[in-house]
């Protein structure tokens, strides 16, 4: 199985900040990477598919980039509703596998 690693498990930032969350794969996944947002209430939403394509209804403050084994999700102008845990998922090879998640919190 392909192992997905999110080295930062938690991240604290201020409102208005630009935040980047990283994800790496144990082998090249050819841009077959999605990003998901899980809110504190458990709601899960697809944000980005195929590395950089914004899912319908997702604010343009969210963007994705990367290639090969290294990928990132960037949130510009952080807003309160962005507080969540973010997961990368590869679908280059079955089984689909997820990173361990990065929990984003507001710095007080």
UniProtKB/Swiss-Prot annotation:
Chain positions covered by the region annotation Complementarity-determining-1: 24-34
An individual GO BP term: immune response
Region (Complementarity-determining-2): 50-56
Short name of any one Pfam family annotated for the protein: V-set
S-S pairs: 23-88
Region listing for Framework-4, in residue ranges: 98-108
Region (Framework-1) residue spans: 1-23
Region (Complementarity-determining-3): 89-97
UniProt keyword terms in alphabetical order: Adaptive immunity, Disulfide bond, Immunity, Immunoglobulin
Matching PROSITE patterns: IG_LIKE (PS50835)
Region annotation Framework-2: where it falls in the sequence: 35-49
Region (Framework-3), start-end ranges: 57-88
Gene3D superfamilies: Immunoglobulins (2.60.40.10)
Leftover remarks: This chain was isolated from a myeloma protein.
Protein known as: Ig kappa chain V-V region MOPC 173
Naturally occurring in which organism (per UniProt): Mus musculus
């Amino acid at each position: 199985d392909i192992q997905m690693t999110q080295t930062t498990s938690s991240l604290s930032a201020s409102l208005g900040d630009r935040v980047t969350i990283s994800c790496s794969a144990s082998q090249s996944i050819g841009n077959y990477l999605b990003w998901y947002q899980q809110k504190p209430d458990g709601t899960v939403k697809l944000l980005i598919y195929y590395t950089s394509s914004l899912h319908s209804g997702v604010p343009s403050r969210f963007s994705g980039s990367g290639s090969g084994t290294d990928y990132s999700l960037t949130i510009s102008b952080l807003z309160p509703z962005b507080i969540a845990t973010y997961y990368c998922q590869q679908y280059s090879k079955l089984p689909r596998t997820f990173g361990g998640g990065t929990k984003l919190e507001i710095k007080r």
